[in-house]
Amino acid sequence: MSFVPDGWQASSSELAGKTILVTGANRGIGEAVALSCAQHGAEVLLLGRDEASLTRVYDQIVDLGCPTPGIIPLDLTTRDPALYDTLADELSGANVALDGLVHNASVLGERRALAQTSPASWDEVLQVNMTAVFLLTRALMPLLEAAPAASVVLTSSGVGRRGKAYWGAYAVSKFATEGYMQVLADELGATSSVRVN
């Protein structure tokens, strides 16, 4: 079932004048999202831990003639809330009103039974896939609320709705992502113009 009318396509200026931050923008789905947003007119802020890969995506966007993106090297295994707050302060100091935040960065971790999952792997997966989502959204919320109709988009997985053996911490993190999305959407629904999906 599709909610998009047959034949509909977004215009190349659909996101003109919008600023969208994409985590995990250095490859895969995050790269595709960043490229698509840029091709529809958005200024994209590319966030990831591998600056060389982010630069490659930056170059692709510039070569397409899209608005010049920004690069934000940030390792989401970092647990220090001050780092996320500093990023928000830097963006605020640059007068950025954030129209979109796409949480795409994710770590798969070990594909083994939960009883055999190492605590280090568990911690890394939950940190990147959920705690960093919380910390980054929390820090950036004032910038999102400064935009007239901002949106927070979280990437989930089928194993975040129905657990499967050997998907371990990844599945648990995606269940947490789904729950976080629902709670945040409910909290903001009556008090803010920020949408959460």
What annotation goes with each model-predicted range?
Residues 26-27:
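Conserved glycine-rich cofactor-binding loop
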Residues 42-56:
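Conserved glycine-rich Rossmann-like NAD(P)H-binding loop of the short-chain dehydrogenase/reductase
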Residues 64-79:
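Rossmann-fold cofactor-recognition segment
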Residues 112-114, 121-126:
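Substrate-binding pocket helix/loop in short-chain dehydrogenase/reductase
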Residues 137, 173:
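Active-site helix of classical SDR
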Residues 142, 186-190:
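Alpha-helical segment proximal to the catalytic Tyr-Lys
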Residues 157:
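Residue(s) in the substrate-gating loop at a strand-loop-helix junction
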